[in-house]
């Protein structure tokens, strides 16, 4: 079996995206990040930064997440984000900005385990972009959510299953059993 080089990508768990619909994933992600860091695996956080005149503002009329405290990673993950390999600031949906793509090339990740907010937007775009670059992308369904509620989250999971494969959308518990079946441990 080929050796794997995994990375955990935590997408946009920021104050401006954490609502009553998405807050439940914060402790799940916190525990997951702690475990990955303890095992010495790479962890990357992303942080979305909107700006004046962005397509989100001009086309969609959406002008949130421009400044603190909205853009800040939630308090529960602040210290952990400082221990991560990187926090990639982005003005687009995906991790794969110039910086994010360079990190992926430089570290040669074979498997990208993605969680965060919003499942149907930035999480989905990141797993699809990883897949299209030949990285085995995994969407962690119970460590991802939509700030708009369950229907958009479920829609994001469904679209991901069509785009990267049903078997690539797993729970954290399935990740743990997957980890025992594949080495090195993830």
Language-model features: where?
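Active-site-adjacent betaalpha module
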Residues: 1-7, 34-39, 63-186
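Short hydrophobic beta-strand that contains or immediately precedes a catalytic carboxylate
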Residues: 9-11
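A cross-domain feature marking catalytic cores of carbohydrate-active enzymes
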Residues: 13, 47-48, 92, 141
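Short acidic, Gly/Ser-rich segments with clustered Asp/Glu that frequently serve as metal-coordination loops
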Residues: 14-21
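Active-site loop signature of alpha/beta-hydrolase-fold enzymes
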Residues: 16, 51-53, 146
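…and closely analogous acidic/polar surface helices at protein-protein or active-site interfaces
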Residues: 21-36
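Von Willebrand factor
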Residues: 36-53
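Metal-dependent catalytic neighborhoods of phosphoester/phosphodiester hydrolases
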Residues: 55-59
């Amino acid at each position: 079996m080929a050796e794997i080089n995994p990375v955990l990508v935590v997408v946009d768990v920021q104050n401006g995206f954490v609502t009553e619909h998405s807050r439940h994933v914060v402790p799940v992600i916190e525990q997951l990040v702690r475990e990955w860091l303890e095992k010495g695996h790479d962890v990357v956080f992303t942080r979305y930064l909107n700006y004046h005149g962005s397509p989100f503002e001009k086309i969609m009329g959406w002008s949130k997440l421009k400044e603190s405290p909205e853009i800040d990673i939630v308090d529960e993950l602040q210290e952990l984000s400082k221990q991560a390999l990187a926090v990639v600031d982005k003005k687009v949906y995906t991790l794969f900005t110039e910086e994010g793509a360079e990190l992926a090339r430089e570290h040669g990740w074979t498997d990208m385990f993605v969680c965060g907010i919003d499942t149907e937007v930035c999480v989905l775009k990141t797993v699809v972009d990883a897949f299209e670059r030949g990285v085995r992308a995994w969407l962690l369904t119970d460590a991802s959510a939509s700030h708009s509620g369950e229907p958009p989250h479920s829609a994001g999971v469904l679209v991901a299953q069509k785009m990267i494969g049903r078997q690539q959308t797993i729970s954290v518990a399935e990740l743990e059993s997957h980890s025992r079946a594949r080495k090195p441990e993830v």
